[in-house]
Structure formats: structure tokens, C-alpha cells
């Protein structure tokens, strides 16, 4: 398989998973034109579109792509039924697209119906986990998002986090503000600054790396807890997550 990221809008990524036999899967096409141009340039035919949630910057290109590729299957959660999804997926369901199997994982938080799609090693997680960060809570609660993170954290270390935005540098600046002496975060920030200076993407990232530099995956870390004002171990780790999200919202 060949993973292709297509920049869209200001900081979005639309993903293509190319089977290297002329066919591909499109993930979260917020706009159609860059997708259609890429399909033409690489001579690819889409087998399906998969949608993680209902926000416009993830679904806005569906209608135009389907208009060109008549009969195209569009997989997504119930909240995308009015955004072009014609195959509704549910938590725990496995879908198969041209021989490629994807596990559907419910990850409420950013939206209530948000799902992720996992086909080792690829995790298409929309606006749930970002590199060094997490999605805003537009509909769900911090506890829901914490539980979603815990579920995704059970995946293997080599999992490729294919998130939908280039937020890494701003997330790392926030992490440095919370834990200024953390060497993993400091080193990775320098690496990402170098990448971005050359116009290169910082994603996908790996779950192994995120365990080190993503504070939202480190709620058990006693140093982090102390920095957030938890002087005794919290009764519930989701309260650490909630405090982190609140601080990020106001950063």
C-alpha cells in the first residue's frame, strides 16, 4: 500500500490509500478539486470514500467526487448520512474495501458520532488524535475523548496516526509550555520546525512517538499531573485530560 496525503484548505490533509494496482480509498475529502487532480495525475480509480465525522472540512468534496465516479461507496457514521454516506458503519464493525479490511472504532469527543478506521498499520482518526495533541470538544465531553484516546492507545506501537490537520508545531509549543524540560518534546519540536521550514508534512506520526510527546496520552505521568496542579494522584485520570484540554483551549 502507498499512503498519500493531499493538502487542502489551510491545514487539512485528505488521505488516499493506494493499493499500487490503480485503485485507492479516499479518506475525509473536505474538498473535491485537489482529490480529483491527484487521481488524474496518478491514474487512480477510487473504490470508496470513508468519512470519520460530519464536519464540512471532512465531507465537503463528497458530492462532486461521487458525481464523477457514479456508484462509489461512501462509508461513514450515522452523523454523515446527510453528508453523502451511503453505507453507515458502527462501532466494532469490520468493512472490506477491495480486499482491505478496516476495523471501525467509535471515538466520541470531537463529535458524538466520530469514528476511526484501522487497517494495520494505518489509523485514520480524523480530528481525534493529532500529533502531540487532541481534537477540540465540539460535541462530546473530556471524559469521552479520554476514553477514546485510551481505546486507540491499545493499538500497536507501529500504528501510523493519519490525522486530518497539520497542528503539530502549535501542539508542541503548548506541550513545551506545560513541560519545558521534557527532552522528548524539545527534540521533536526542533525536528518538526525543520520539516515545516522545508514545507514538509509532520504526519503521519506513530503511536510509539505519540506516547512520548503527546501529553494527552500521558495523563498517568506524575510529573505532568504535578504541573497541572494535581498534588495527589487524581481519582480519575480523565480529570487530568480535562485540565489539559481546558488549558489548550486557552493557550
Swiss-Prot record:
- Recorded E.C. number(s)? 3.1.2.6
What residues bind Zn(2+) 1, as annotated? 53, 55, 110, 127
**Catalytic activity field:** an S-(2-hydroxyacyl)glutathione + H2O = a 2-hydroxy carboxylate + glutathione + H(+)
GO BP terms: namely: methylglyoxal catabolic process to D-lactate via S-lactoyl-glutathione
Question: Which pathway does the record list?
Answer: Secondary metabolite metabolism; methylglyoxal degradation; (R)-lactate from methylglyoxal: step 2/2
Requisite cofactors: Zn(2+)
Q: Which Pfam families match?
A: HAGH_C (PF16123), Lactamase_B (PF00753)
Q: How is the cofactor bound?
A: Binds 2 Zn(2+) ions per subunit.
The chain's disulfide connectivity reads none
InterPro entries membership: Clx_II_MBL, Glyoxalase_II_hydrolase, HAGH_C, Hydroxyacylglutathione_Hdrlase, Metallo-B-lactamas, RibonucZ/Hydroxyglut_hydro
Which leading EC class covers this enzyme? hydrolase
- Hydrolase keyword on record: yes
**Which positions in this protein are listed as binding Zn(2+) 2?**
57-58, 127, 165
Cited Gene3D superfamilies: Ribonuclease Z/Hydroxyacylglutathione hydrolase-like
Q: Which GO terms describe its molecular function?
A: hydroxyacylglutathione hydrolase activity; metal ion binding
Q: Which UniProt keywords apply?
A: Hydrolase, Metal-binding, Zinc
What does the protein in this record do? Thiolesterase that catalyzes the hydrolysis of S-D-lactoyl-glutathione to form glutathione and D-lactic acid.
**Entry similarity comment:** Belongs to the metallo-beta-lactamase superfamily. Glyoxalase II family.
Question: Which NCBIfam families does the entry link to?
Answer: GSH_gloB
The record describes its quaternary structure and partners as: Monomer.
The identity of this protein, by name, is Hydroxyacylglutathione hydrolase
What is the protein's species of origin?
Serratia proteamaculans (strain 568)
Q: Which gene encodes it?
A: gloB
